[in-house]
Amino acid sequence: MHPQQLVVSWFSLVLLASPIVAIWELEKNVYIVELDWYPDAPGETVVLTCDTPEEDGITWTSDQSSEVLGSGKTLTIQVKEFGDAGQYTCHKGGEALSRSLLLLHKKEDGIWSTDILKDQKEPKAKSFLKCEAKDYSGHFTCWWLTAISTDLKFSVKSSRGSADPRGVTCGAASLSAEKVSVDHREYNKYTVECQEGSTCPAAEESLLIEVVVEAVHKLKYENYTSSFFIRDIIKPDPPKNLQLKPLKNSRQVEVSWEYPDTWSTPHSYFSLTFCVQVQGKNKREKKLFMDQTSAKVTCHKDANVRVQARDRYYSSFWSEWASVSCS
């Protein structure tokens, strides 16, 4: 590459800011400006450079203003608020030469804004992302809630460890068909599926998996992070094939079930423990805990027998209930 071309390419990709670097490239021609958000804040000085070998006859416009903002190959602006963000375009002779989109990431009292996603407050405050795994294969699902329904974009990236990252691939975030109601308000639910590239289900985990969701709403940028071991987000599927078998000369029945198809194998190593409960219309019997896949219970008319599972050796989340009717 010719030295002059190298200089042009370098300047076309870089925005110059104040000595504290508060501007970075999210993707090609999209830049994040980090701002301290308080009254009379000075903002950030941003220098935009037109991606062209031309030197003369260049003018600048913004989608936030109908006026010509300046002329020349560079444009210096002061970014203080959302009215200063948006798309900037350099022109010559009526032709658009290049565009740069500025998004704002605001910080108030030293804390980055979290306006886009709903705080689910479980298992602790500031829990914006929730993730679960059905087994130890390295596949997991994450989801989040938002009240916003338009002008919204998400991207997800993940890795195991930061010093020596191992690949975790995440798909595109998808909007669930059903809304989620929380505190008498409806939210949109987004989910994403992720898979660790190389994993040994039986190996002890030493490096945390980190998931980062980048959210853009109009001209606002935010990011949200969750870190975990797979073992800490395990939630098996419910037991399958529940069956009731009457016992001779007894008011009891034998309820039996099988491991869910999605659970890790061999089951002799990846073992589950189970909780069994008879649930009537107005009463729930005492829960029974066991490692085997059958139990004897007293099954009343109009009652259900329900069973749930969790990892036997590590205190994972309990699965949802599987149930079978006594009648």
Swiss-Prot record:
Domain Fibronectin type-III: start-end pairs: 238-327
Gene designation: IL12B
Name of the protein described by the UniProt record: Interleukin-12 subunit beta
Stored PANTHER family: INTERLEUKIN-12 SUBUNIT BETA (PTHR48485:SF4), INTERLEUKIN-12 SUBUNIT BETA-RELATED (PTHR48485)
Entry-listed glycosylation sites: 223
TM region positions: none
GO molecular function, one term: cytokine activity
Assembly and interaction partners: Heterodimer with IL12A; disulfide-linked. The heterodimer is known as interleukin IL-12. Heterodimer with IL23A; disulfide-linked. The heterodimer is known as interleukin IL-23. Also secreted as a monomer. Interacts with NBR1; this interaction promotes IL-12 secretion.
Function: Cytokine that can act as a growth factor for activated T and NK cells, enhance the lytic activity of NK/lymphokine-activated killer cells, and stimulate the production of IFN-gamma by resting PBMC. Associates with IL23A to form the IL-23 interleukin, a heterodimeric cytokine which functions in innate and adaptive immunity. IL-23 may constitute with IL-17 an acute response to infection in peripheral tissues. IL-23 binds to a heterodimeric receptor complex composed of IL12RB1 and IL23R, activates the Jak-Stat signaling cascade, stimulates memory rather than naive T-cells and promotes production of pro-inflammatory cytokines. IL-23 induces autoimmune inflammation and thus may be responsible for autoimmune inflammatory diseases and may be important for tumorigenesis.
Residue pairs linked by disulfide bridges in the UniProt entry: 50-90
GO cellular component, one term: membrane
UniProt KW keywords: Cytokine, Disulfide bond, Glycoprotein, Immunoglobulin domain, Signal
PROSITE patterns (UniProt xref): FN3 (PS50853), HEMATOPO_REC_L_F3 (PS01354), IG_LIKE (PS50835)
Domain Ig-like C2-type, chain residue ranges per copy: 23-106
Segment forming the signal sequence: 1-22
Classification via InterPro entries: FN3_dom (IPR003961), FN3_sf (IPR036116), Hematopoietin_rcpt_L_F3_CS (IPR003530), Ig-like_dom (IPR007110), Ig-like_dom_sf (IPR036179), Ig-like_fold (IPR013783), Ig_sub2 (IPR003598), IL-12 (IPR050676)
